Curated annotation (Swiss-Prot):
Modified residues (Phosphoserine): 137
GO cellular component terms attached to this protein's record: centrosome; cilium; endomembrane system; intraciliary transport particle B
Annotated source species: Rattus norvegicus
Encoding gene (name): Ift22
Entry's family note: Belongs to the small GTPase superfamily. Rab family.
Sites where the protein binds GTP: 10-17, 63-67, 123-126
GO BP: intracellular protein transport
Keyword field contains Transmembrane helix: no
Alphabetized GO MF terms: GTP binding; GTPase activity
Lineage, highest ranks first: Eukaryota, Metazoa, Chordata, Craniata, Vertebrata
Job description of the protein: Small GTPase-like component of the intraflagellar transport (IFT) complex B.
InterPro entries: P-loop_NTPase (IPR027417)
Protein name: Intraflagellar transport protein 22 homolog
Pfam families found in the cross-reference section: Roc
Length: 185
């Protein structure tokens, strides 16, 4: 059974924990409480299997605290990560600049493929959720961008997250198959 490690990173108060709980069908948190360090959620998704074999997959979703005081822990969090989801609050202009640092640190410096990274513009309840005017600078503008609004259209982000998980698992499966072929030949 394949096991994938996915990091949820991004600025403070961007909605990482709320989104992580929703996507893993964990408990709801009603009041804001900053994540201290990391919170690991383990889950399986029946819609995601390894290739056509129907083999199940396990996931670890690492909900990482957004405070820079945890920066010394980041190398340990990044170890053996298969994917990174950068969550930001689209209604806070400074977050657009901050996600460049998150991308550089968690994707570029780890030599993670861009296809293993997804941006989530999280719109908090009552924010209106304007999806049109996000000016992302290169190389962020090449990444998969998903808007999440759990109040108005919760299933959109769930569907996109499942597609993302499938792409991670397919990549892991192909890599494992290549390694097995090298052993055989």
């Amino acid at each position: 059974m394949l096991k994938a490690k996915i990091l949820f990173v991004g600025p403070c108060e961007s909605g990482k924990t709320v989104l992580a709980n929703f996507l893993t069908e964990s408990s709801d948190i009603t009041e804001y409480n900053p994540t201290q360090g990391v919170r690991i959620l383990e889950f399986e998704n029946p819609h995601v299997t390894s290739n056509n074999k129907g083999t199940g997959c396990e996931f670890e979703l690492w909900d990482c605290g957004g405070d820079s005081k945890f920066e010394s822990c980041w190398p340990a969090l990044m170890k053996d990560a298969h994917g990174v989801v950068i969550v930001f609050n689209a209604d806070i202009p400074s977050h657009l600049k901050e996600i460049e640092m998150w991308y550089s640190c968690f994707v570029q410096q780890q030599f993670l493929q861009d296809s293993h990274c997804m941006l989530v513009a999280h719109h908090k309840p009552g924010s209106g959720g304007d999806k049109s005017n996000l000016a992302l600078s290169p190389p962020l503008n090449k990444l998969k961008l998903v808007h999440s609004n759990l109040e108005e259209d919760p299933e959109e982000v769930r569907v996109e997250f499942i597609k993302y998980l499938k792409s991670i698992i397919n990549s892991m499966s192909e890599s494992r198959d290549r390694e097995e072929m090298l052993i055989i030949t």
